[in-house]
């Protein structure tokens, strides 16, 4: 954390526990690297950028030291190492504090983007993205400890997936993004007292 900026890097290993991808009786190991850059633009506004990449231990590659790079732009490393070398996503987030009681937040994630397919207007599966819009209302209607939350989430089909199935965003058969994985729309309404 420095000034109004917070920067986080994480690296870890994951397991693909599907029987069809075992290697010598052991579950397949894959790795993930993440960057998250958050900036408090003002006392009310926070914006963030993030990226993540998953890769496998193909050809005894192991943990790829290229992904120790502390600077954002994993997509360039993924491109340099080959199409099936990894699965990268990028995204942005924002949070705005209207007052002490009301916050709005959003997030956008981009897995794959094809401008030609957007121009064609055919709703191509190649454009894989998701977004979230939400708001929280603390001490709602001046009732102490009453919190109300409304959130809309939408993720296009095949987001977080890859041509090489082992490069999907999952660990121990659980989605790492949303319980429903991809291809969904949901409205979440929460009230707590």
Task: Report the location of each language-model feature.
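Signature for the C-terminal beta-barrel architecture of outer-membrane proteins
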Residues: 2-191
């Amino acid at each position: 954390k420095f000034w109004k900026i917070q920067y986080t890097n994480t690296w870890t290993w994951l397991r693909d526990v599907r029987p069809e991808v075992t290697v010598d009786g052991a579950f397949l190991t894959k790795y993930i690297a993440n960057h998250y850059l958050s900036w408090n633009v003002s006392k009310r506004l926070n914006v963030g950028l993030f990226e993540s990449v998953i890769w496998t231990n193909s050809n005894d590659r192991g943990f790829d030291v290229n992904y120790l790079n502390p600077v954002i732009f994993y997509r360039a490393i993924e491109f340099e190492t080959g199409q099936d070398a990894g699965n990268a996503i990028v995204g942005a987030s924002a949070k705005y504090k209207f007052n002490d009681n009301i916050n709005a937040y959003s997030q956008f994630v981009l897995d794959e983007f094809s401008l030609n397919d957007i121009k064609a207007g055919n709703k191509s599966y190649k454009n894989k993205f998701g977004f979230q819009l939400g708001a929280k209302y603390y001490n709602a209607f001046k009732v102490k400890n009453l919190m109300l939350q409304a959130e809309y989430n939408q993720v296009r089909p095949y987001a977080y997936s890859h041509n090489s199935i082992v490069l999907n965003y999952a660990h121990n058969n659980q989605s790492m993004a949303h319980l429903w994985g991809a291809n969904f729309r949901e409205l979440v309404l929460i009230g707590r007292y």
